[in-house]
């Protein structure tokens, strides 16, 4: 019986729908794990073959058939090593989320996921079934009994306990667990608890990469049979993680493992957003992006994110001044572009704005200017930016933040124009925090201090500031965090110390702007409750509370 078992954990990105390419890569990685790392077992993330989440691709018989052919091809290419590969298995009229054990050219066993998450961003019960006969997978490698579970199974005590009862002392857990603030500490605590409950050693592998609004952070870990969690692998990093499992002590010895100890929340959020932009562009065929740069904090932060994601040479900033644009705004935009090495173009919106006013003048005769004229300026900018992206290629990044999306402080078909919204799940107060943090991690100031310290303004009328229409952001974001992220009631929010009139004003804005959010571009989820697939409120909604 061997003293140790070498495990190679493939913390890589496997794009959704790219079945043939993923299969080729999995085969190549299996060979690399065997030949270069000397691994006895190689494991891949949850649904690595199809990518996660495949969503309604799982309703297409042809897609499932393609996955079946691909897993057989991977199995046929697997020799001299055991591979654990996640994929969607069709069995008659039902589909299972499975991990198959491949060895010696064939599928040896297949484990079917037992706990299907159906909350927040997850809707696995829409697609998958649980095997009514139950599922347990335990196999031996070099005399070591190894079990398999999948992601959500570990959040319940019974699946791991059952696997250990089946003889497993080491359990491999492939995952597709998206990032959100505080997730790392939550995962580590859970893993330690499960290991202590059962005495099992756990190899927890998470996928990495951006998929539309989800960003998977990797941060894979191993936990010994005493509940000790080894420092997590670098978050948002594509890498091999190779460990030796020492059977006599039920512990792991890392051989190839780029670990991280303490990483700040701001650093993790930054990496998540950068990876979200990077992968959204790469997976949708965009090599460059456009950013409308106003001299304000939101667009400045988006520009810095874009540069970190794609490089300065793939980013073009555009100033779009109007009669209300302060000279300081133009200067700060130019300062940032010079500092980051970004090309800056300037297109004045006055001719477009004046043309719209002239065209609408006869219909608007006798009516006082209001938000309509302000929105015309924003929509003039949207038309110009979309035209540039259309003519020269590239993706327009929109610059709104979560506070603005929540209360509708954004112009539909104006500053909401764009294909991806990097700040969509980041409140305005967090925007300032991230900007200040980003300036501490490099010699070059990514965001001019003048941008950070000036009062926020849409500059759509003279002497305008955001606080003309909204409570101070620390108040607004506090209310929104309780209402949106924590689903607290009006009464609970007032009891937390916020004035009833302000609470009513903010909650009404959230309600009446649902229609705008339904038309907003996707953006990376970094909070426990992001707008989009995990907050599905009706647009036509009479409930208030």
UniProtKB/Swiss-Prot annotation:
- Binding sites annotated in the UniProt record for deamido-NAD(+): 375, 404, 516
The active site annotation covers 46 (proton acceptor), 113 (for glutaminase activity), 151 (nucleophile)
Catalytic activity of the protein: deamido-NAD(+) + L-glutamine + ATP + H2O = L-glutamate + AMP + diphosphate + NAD(+) + H(+)
Task: Please list the residue ranges annotated as the CN hydrolase domain.
Answer: 5-247
**From the Swiss-Prot or TrEMBL record, what is one GO molecular function term?**
NAD+ synthase activity
Give the UniProt entry's GO cellular component terms. Answer: cytoplasm
Annotated segments matching region Ligase: 269-545
Query: Where ATP is bound, by residue?
Result: 292-299, 399
Enzyme Commission number(s) of this protein = 6.3.5.1
A single GO BP term for this record reads: NAD biosynthetic process
Q: InterPro entries, alphabetically?
A: C-N_Hydrolase, C-N_Hydrolase_sf, Gln-dep_NAD_synthase, NAD/GMP_synthase, NAD_synthase, Nitrilase/CN_hydratase_CS, Rossmann-like_a/b/a_fold
- Top-level taxon of origin: Bacteria
Pathway in which the depicted protein is active = Cofactor biosynthesis; NAD(+) biosynthesis; NAD(+) from deamido-NAD(+) (L-Gln route): step 1/1
Task: Keywords in alphabetical order, please.
Answer: ATP-binding, Ligase, NAD, Nucleotide-binding
PROSITE patterns linked to this entry? CN_HYDROLASE, NITRIL_CHT_1
Per UniProt, L-glutamine binds at 119, 177, 183
The protein's job, in short, is:
Catalyzes the ATP-dependent amidation of deamido-NAD to form NAD. Uses L-glutamine as a nitrogen source.
Q: What is this protein called?
A: Glutamine-dependent NAD(+) synthetase
Q: What is the lineage of its organism?
A: Bacteria, Pseudomonadati, Pseudomonadota, Gammaproteobacteria, Lysobacterales
Gene (UniProt): nadE
């Amino acid at each position: 019986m061997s003293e140790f078992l070498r495990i190679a954990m493939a913390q890589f990105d496997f794009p959704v729908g790219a079945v043939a390419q993923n299969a080729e890569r999995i085969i190549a990685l299996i060979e690399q794990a065997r030949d270069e790392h000397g691994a006895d077992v190689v494991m891949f993330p949850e649904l690595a073959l199809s990518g996660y989440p495949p969503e309604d691709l799982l309703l297409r018989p042809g897609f499932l058939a393609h996955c079946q052919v691909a897993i057989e091809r991977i199995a046929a290419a697997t020799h001299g090593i055991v591979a654990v590969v996640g994929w969607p298995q069709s069995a008659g009229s039902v589909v299972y989320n499975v991990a198959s054990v491949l060895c010696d050219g064939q599928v040896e066993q297949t484990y079917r996921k037992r706990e299907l998450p159906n909350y927040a961003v997850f809707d696995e019960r829409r697609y998958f079934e649980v095997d009514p006969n139950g599922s347990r997978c335990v196999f031996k490698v070099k005399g070591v009994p190894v079990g398999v579970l999948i992601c959500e199974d570990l959040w319940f005590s019974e699946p791991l306990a059952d696997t250990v009862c089946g003889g497993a002392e080491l359990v491999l857990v492939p995952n597709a667990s998206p990032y959100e603030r505080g997730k790392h500490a939550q995962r580590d605590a859970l893993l330690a608890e499960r290991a202590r409950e059962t005495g099992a050693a756990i190899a927890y592998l998470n996928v990495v990469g951006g998929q539309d609004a989800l960003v998977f952070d990797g941060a894979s870990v191993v936990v010994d049979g005493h509940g000790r969690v080894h420092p997590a692998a670098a978050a948002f990093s594509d890498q091999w993680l190779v460990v030796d499992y020492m059977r006599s002590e039920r512990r792991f010895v890392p051989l190839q493992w780029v670990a991280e100890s303490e990483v700040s929340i701001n650093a993790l959020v930054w990496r998540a957003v950068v990876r979200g932009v990077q992968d959204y562009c790469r997976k949708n065929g965009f090599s460059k992006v456009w950013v409308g740069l106003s001299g304000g904090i939101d667009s400045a932060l988006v520009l810095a994110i874009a540069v970190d994601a794609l490089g300065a040479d793939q980013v073009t900033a555009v100033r779009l001044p109007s009669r209300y644009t302060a000279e300081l705004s133009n200067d700060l935009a130019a300062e940032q572009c010079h500092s980051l090495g970004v090309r800056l173009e300037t297109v004045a919106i006055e001719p477009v704005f004046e043309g719209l006013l002239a065209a609408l003048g006869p219909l608007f005769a006798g009516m006082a200017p209001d938000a309509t004229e302000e929105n015309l300026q924003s929509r003039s900018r949207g038309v110009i930016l979309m035209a540039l992206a259309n003519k020269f290629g590239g993706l327009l990044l929109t610059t709104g933040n979560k506070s603005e999306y929540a209360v509708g402080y954004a112009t539909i078909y104006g500053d909401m124009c764009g294909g991806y919204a990097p700040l969509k799940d980041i409140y305005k107060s967090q925007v300032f925090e991230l900007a200040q943090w980003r300036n501490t991690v490099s010699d070059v100031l990514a965001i001019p201090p003048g941008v950070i310290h000036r009062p926020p303004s849409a500059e759509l009328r003279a002497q305008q500031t955001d606080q003309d229409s909204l409570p101070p952001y620390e108040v607004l974001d506090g209310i929104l965090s309780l209402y949106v992220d924590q689903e607290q009631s009006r009464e609970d929010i007032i009891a937390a110390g916020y004035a009833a009139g302000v609470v009513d004003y903010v909650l009404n804005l959230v309600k009446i702007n649902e229609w705008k959010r339904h038309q907003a571009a996707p953006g990376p989820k970094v909070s426990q409750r992001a707008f989009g697939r995990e907050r599905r409120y009706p647009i036509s909604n009479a409930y208030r509370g």
